[in-house]
From Swiss-Prot:
SUPFAM superfamilies: Cytochrome c. It is found in: Mitochondrion intermembrane space. This is Cytochrome c. Keywords: Acetylation, Electron transport, Heme, Iron, Metal-binding, Mitochondrion, Respiratory chain, Transport. It comes from the Eukaryota. Pfam families: Cytochrom_C. Electron carrier protein. The oxidized form of the cytochrome c heme group can accept an electron from the heme group of the cytochrome c1 subunit of cytochrome reductase. Cytochrome c then transfers this electron to the cytochrome oxidase complex, the final protein carrier in the mitochondrial electron-transport chain. Heme c binds at residues 15, 18-19, 81. The gene is cyc. Binds 1 heme c group covalently per subunit. The modification N-acetylglycine is found at residue 2. It comes from Tetraodon nigroviridis. Belongs to the cytochrome c family. One of its GO terms (molecular function) is heme binding.
Length: 104
């Protein structure tokens, strides 16, 4: 799907301030992303989500993340994620490839 090395660079620049990816990693401003793929929105244990995230009810996978990461607040109105999104599809695909490799 994407380039894992480029995706890691994007994660460090745009995501790591608020998220961790390793198993047992702590929640920061955003939840730890270990086990992200195949999990429903708003389900990371021990993280306090908005009702919007808890009730969205979609399963995270490559397709849902591709859409979400373009404009998080449009995809889940009411989310507390303050990230504006990534407009370039290739950059989102690289990030998703990295997340897939590092969160399971």
């Amino acid at each position: 799907m994407g380039d894992i090395a480029k995706g890691k660079k994007t994660f460090v620049q745009k995501c790591a301030q608020c998220h961790t990816v390793e198993e047992g990693g702590k929640h920061k401003t955003g939840p730890n992303l270990w086990g992200l793929f195949g999990r429903k929105t708003g389900q990371a244990e021990g993280f306090s989500y908005t009702d919007a995230n808890k009730s969205k009810g979609i399963i995270w996978n490559e397709d849902t993340l591709l859409e979400y990461l373009e404009n998080p607040k449009k995809y889940i109105p009411g989310t507390k994620m303050i990230f504006a999104g990534i407009k370039k599809k290739a950059e989102r695909q690289d990030l998703i490839a990295y997340l897939k490799s590092s969160t399971s």
